[in-house]
Amino acid sequence: MTRRPAHLLLSAAAWLGFFVVTVWTIAFLAGVVVPRTVDGPDRTTTARAVAIDLALLLFFAVQHSVMARRQVKSWLSRRIPAALERTYYVLVTDICLALLLVLWQPWGEQIWHVEGPVAVIAWSLFAAGWVLAITATFAVDHLELVGLRQAGWAAARDPGLTTDLYVGGLYAVVRHPMMTGLVLAFWATPRMGASHLLFALAATGYIAVGIRFEERDLRNTFGASYDDYAARVPALLPRLPIRRGSVHSPDPSRRPTPQRWTR
């Protein structure tokens, strides 16, 4: 693979943006550090705030989904180097999420507010959700997910390692560990306001729809192997421990391919 300086710089900028908006989103939902958070003092009328927030959420969802479609990727690949296709996706997603965080309008009353040990539990779950979501990006190859591998920062993956369905590690517990972590992070809070509730509901709904599309693609790719995996492992919520031997042991040597939904 040719390592072109322009490709390396642009992909590094996209990854840096990914890192910044991830930390920014954590602070946004936690209500710390950043000037505008998911809940806060009203800045405009409730109707206007709800309309703006819904528009921002829809804009992000459309961008995140449409740019992941094969037709759009094919169109884009005819106009930019193939090594930068993923980088452009990450970069545009960074910008759209940053716009949401900057333009978000807090509104409404507080839904719940807990303190003491319950608040500690809520914050612990919030942190655990983000740790799970971020850890899951490395389970599917973080460098490829953010476009660094394609741009030349690391060796290209061996195509032979992407032919099997990976069901080890976090994927032996739930089929979509990244989404499990995000949903947990969206809902685990000691202070839930109306605008936070809107964000959590919309984001969770988008994840649910995205999972359906992703699983359709995975079934088309892996066929009966994925059907068997889906029958044994839940999508988002881990099952209670079951008797040893009732689930096939995964082959830990099999590595996953970054899935469409992570796009």
What annotation goes with each model-predicted range?
Residues 31-43, 72-77, 105-117:
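Membrane-interface helix termini and inter-helical loops of multi-pass transporters
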Residues 66-74, 104-112, 137-153, 214:
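Juxtamembrane/interfacial segments flanking transmembrane helices
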Residues 44-58, 118-135:
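Alpha-helical transmembrane segments
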Residues 19-20, 24-27, 47, 56, ...:
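Hydrophobic transmembrane alpha-helices
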Residues 7-24, 49-54, 83-96:
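Alpha-helical transmembrane segments of integral membrane proteins, especially early/N-terminal helices
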Residues 40-48, 75-92, 155-160:
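Juxtamembrane helix-capping/reentrant segments at transmembrane boundaries
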Residues 88-94, 118-133, 170-180:
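Membrane-interface loop-to-helix entry segments
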Residues 1-6:
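Short, Lys/Arg-rich, polar N-terminal cytosolic tail immediately upstream
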